[in-house]
Design a protein with these regions (language model features):
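Juxtamembrane intracellular "pre-TM" segments in multi-pass secondary transporters
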Residues: 1-5, 178-204
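Paired small-residue
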Residues: 83, 94-102
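Extracytoplasmic gate region of multi-pass secondary transporters
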Residues: 28-29, 199-240
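Cytoplasmic helix-loop-helix junction between adjacent transmembrane helices
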Residues: 100-136
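Extracytoplasmic
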Residues: 10-36, 218-223
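Helix-loop-helix hairpin linking two adjacent transmembrane segments in secondary transporters
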Residues: 130-177
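Residue-level signature of mid-helix packing/kink "hotspots" within the transmembrane helices
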Residues: 26, 50-58, 143
Length: 240
């Protein structure tokens, strides 16, 4: 059966999407201290991001099964873009919480969706390699974001640069085809409860839950800690 999409183009789009997630995960780190200097309560923003990432990660699966990958990738990227712009524009703490929630929610969807689509479009012989390359794109996005903030003092400029690049990629997503939706069988509540009888599954879930939480929040606070207690200059703390 002939595919209705280009595997290479879908893979490139997935890599771009996960790179955006890398930006989203580290977005607060370099700018949290400047925000706290002018806005009381900014240090609570990472908690809101964690809630957004959690919800996005949970909800993307049923939506993909029903509607497919393409427009969910577009919408999640647009939410991430709007979150970045909110951080660049707003000075009100409530609007910043809304922005960071959108950023986390969109990023959580991007993380799950991009891994899912790459796992679907490649067979067993290539899947592992392609997923490894995809994971490296997360690091690329995070590294580029860190370097931009290291060399540019005004944090709004990297936010705007990332937004422009993301807008161009969203246009690219709209122009290519993705694998169609594959509605799955109905999953009953008893099926879900039945998973609780596997202790190893629960253990791995708990480990990943706390690991992801620490990963998401530690990057936001590390720069502030190194600057305030480690004696590092702000630029050096950002690069760390």
């Amino acid at each position: 059966m002939q595919k209705s999409y280009s595997t290479n183009l879908v893979f490139i789009a997935s890599c771009a999407g996960l790179a955006f997630f890398g930006v989203a995960m580290l977005s607060l780190g370099p700018i949290l201290t400047p925000l706290q200097a002018v806005i009381d309560g900014a240090y609570a923003l990472p908690s809101t991001m964690s809630i957004g990432i959690l919800l996005g990660t949970i909800l993307f699966g049923p939506v993909v099964d029903k509607f497919g990958y393409k427009w969910l990738l577009v919408v999640s990227s647009a939410l991430t873009l709007m979150g970045l712009q909110g951080l660049a524009i707003f000075k009100d703490i409530n609007l910043l919480h809304l922005s960071i929630f959108m950023l986390g929610f969109g990023g959580g969807i991007l993380n799950g969706e991009t891994n899912a689509v790459v796992a679907e479009i490649y067979d067993d012989n290539k899947r592992g390699t392609k997923l490894a390359i995809l994971g490296a794109c997360y690091c690329v996005g995070a590294l580029i974001w860190t370097l931009l903030n290291y060399f540019i003092e005004d944090y709004t400029i990297p936010l705007n640069v990332a937004s422009v690049v993301m807008a161009g990629c969203i246009a690219f997503f709209c122009c290519i085809s993705f694998p169609p939706a594959k509605p799955s069988e109905n999953v009953t509540f008893s099926n879900v409860v039945g998973l609780l009888k596997y202790p190893s599954l629960i253990l791995f879930a708990l480990v990943l839950f706390f690991q992801s939480a620490f990963e998401g929040t530690s990057g936001s606070y590390t720069i502030s800690y190194l600057g305030n207690f480690g004696g590092l200059a702000e630029s050096d703390a950002k690069l760390s």
